[in-house]
């Protein structure tokens, strides 16, 4: 019982830390709305550097064996290919939102995400909602409607962020690999596409400069 309580408390602290960091992200990304590159190149850069630092952290971690073992498991690779796609879409939408004046929409998306995860847990894994969780889900739906009805349109940015991140969390829960090895595997699966896109974008930029 004490072990369960400790794990719950630790999970809560980790979650609060993650959302505090995410809450500060706009302070870093928003100034880049004046940069001569779009969200697509920002995403590619983020993938490249995430892969580099993730591999570095794994090199000094005891979970290297789990990571290398995963490469020989096609089902695991397939699950992480799906999770990599989901998180790449999530990052792309988020970067576009922050650099195009949709900070509040992005914030709403990540506000609703934990509640959407609760709903997925109920529907997919059969987890039971207590009264507080059910009330939180209802309040989230009311909050979305409260923001959407006055402007006469659906908050697509928030909904897409919620959906992509929720599906990402669902796939990661199904994948039999720890957080750090999973992050390394995801970023390495995305790395070839990101690197190829950066090379393509750089060539396009050089061609435009040569024309000018």
Regions found by a protein language model. Name each.
Residues 32, 42, 97-98, 123-125, ...:
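Hydrophobic/aromatic residues within transmembrane alpha-helices
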Residues 110, 126-146, 151-159, 187:
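Loop-to-transmembrane alpha-helix entry segments
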Residues 65-104, 146:
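Specific transmembrane alpha-helical segments of multi-pass solute transporters/efflux pumps
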Residues 34-41, 92-109, 178-180:
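Structural motif at transmembrane-helix junctions in multi-pass transporters
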Residues 1-16, 52-82, 131, 183, ...:
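Membrane-interface interhelical linkers
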Residues 1-41, 142-174:
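Glycine-/small-residue-enriched transmembrane alpha-helix faces in small-molecule transporters
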Residues 27-39, 66-68, 99-102, 142-145, ...:
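Membrane-interface helix termini and inter-helical loops of multi-pass transporters
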Residues 96, 113-132:
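C-terminal transmembrane-helix exit sites in multi-pass transporters
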